[in-house]
Amino acid sequence: MKIAIVNDMPLAVEALRRALAFEPAHQVVWVASNGAEAVRLCAENTPDLILMDLIMPVMDGVEATRRIMAESPCAIVIVTVDRQQNVHRVFEAMGHGALDVVDTPAIGGGNPQEAAAPLLRKILNIGWLIGEKTARSRPAPAAPRSTASRQRLVAIGSSAGGPAALEVLLKGLPRHFSAAIVLVQHVDQVFAAGMAEWLASASGLDVRLAREGEPPQAGAVLLAGTNHHIRLLKNGTLAYTAEPVNEIYRPSIDVFFESVANYWNGDAVGVLLTGMGRDGAQGLKLMRQQGYLTIAQDQQSSAVYGMPKAAAAIDAAVEIRPLEKIAPRLLEIFPK
């Protein structure tokens, strides 16, 4: 994989070079010391992946991510020495299309290969995404269920560009929205709690991490909060599970959407937002096959038109809408 490094700290650049050296297939094609230089170099020689720092002179990593995704799009992973201190910048960069975030590998002390493992694992997953691997087979649709209980659920999946898209969508809903909401965003569990707090502050809604064994409830927005998959069980409660182990991203949107299609006893809407790859497309199609309304974000409003495009390609979405039109549509479907 052709990889670029954007970082103004020589020690951090060296740490990344050493980590990448453990995988001979990775090649560092260029290094930039600030965001402006990265924008220029990316236009001249677009890599497969950029390892982007956040705090740099001239232009920071957030603005560089925005510019690159608009002008010379490619996969971007935020690499920082202090994720917790930079949590809001991380979400902003992810809103512009960054795929993931990881700590800068340490130099000195301990096992260097072990220190490099988290970064190399994320790069491996992204390699699968940008390689557009064939979609995995899915279980056959379950038999239609009675919806006499009339419980209401909105199942939302998002990835690159998701934090900003979720902020817009949730701001368009009232605090006492009549449907339960469950969010599956591709984000490391280290950041899940911070993301829930950020979305709650931005939207004014009750956004929190989903807890094992609790049912989705109207008025609550539950965010998948671990690196395991979240799924709906037959009894209507939520559970975290390591299976299936072959899913590239954890938590998987497909896994959750499929569980909703199979086990939700009520009315539901599936919403697939911006993101790279195709996670969520097959699950959304299964929801549609079960008679649920399904919505995909349109290309123009998507930071990364990957997952919604995959859904549109297999006719998984009943409706394709601009981001700003999705919340009003949900209010039409589930009025007070």
From Swiss-Prot:
Top-level taxon: Bacteria
GO-annotated molecular function: phosphorelay response regulator activity; protein-glutamate methylesterase activity; protein-glutamine glutaminase activity
Occurrences of domain CheB-type methylesterase (ranges): 147-336
Comment block on domains: Contains a C-terminal catalytic domain, and an N-terminal region which modulates catalytic activity.
Gene: cheB1
Record GO biological process: chemotaxis
InterPro entries with a match to the protein in the record: CheB-like (IPR008248), CheB_C (IPR035909), CheY-like_superfamily (IPR011006), Sig_transdc_resp-reg_Me-estase (IPR000673), Sig_transdc_resp-reg_receiver (IPR001789)
Residues annotated as catalytic: S159, H186, D279
Entry keywords, A to Z: Chemotaxis, Cytoplasm, Hydrolase, Phosphoprotein
Entry-annotated residues carrying 4-aspartylphosphate: D53
EC number: 3.1.1.61, 3.5.1.44
Function description: Involved in chemotaxis. Part of a chemotaxis signal transduction system that modulates chemotaxis in response to various stimuli. Catalyzes the demethylation of specific methylglutamate residues introduced into the chemoreceptors (methyl-accepting chemotaxis proteins or MCP) by CheR. Also mediates the irreversible deamidation of specific glutamine residues to glutamic acid.
The record's account of how the chain is modified after translation: Phosphorylated by CheA. Phosphorylation of the N-terminal regulatory domain activates the methylesterase activity.
Keyword match Ubl conjugation: no
Cellular location(s): Cytoplasm
Protein name (record): Protein-glutamate methylesterase/protein-glutamine glutaminase 1
Protein family: Belongs to the CheB family.
Chief localisation class: cytoplasm
Organism this protein belongs to: Pseudomonas fluorescens (strain Pf0-1)
UniProt domain Response regulatory: residue ranges: 2-119
An annotated GO cellular component: cytoplasm
Reaction catalyzed: [protein]-L-glutamate 5-O-methyl ester + H2O = L-glutamyl-[protein] + methanol + H(+); L-glutaminyl-[protein] + H2O = L-glutamyl-[protein] + NH4(+)
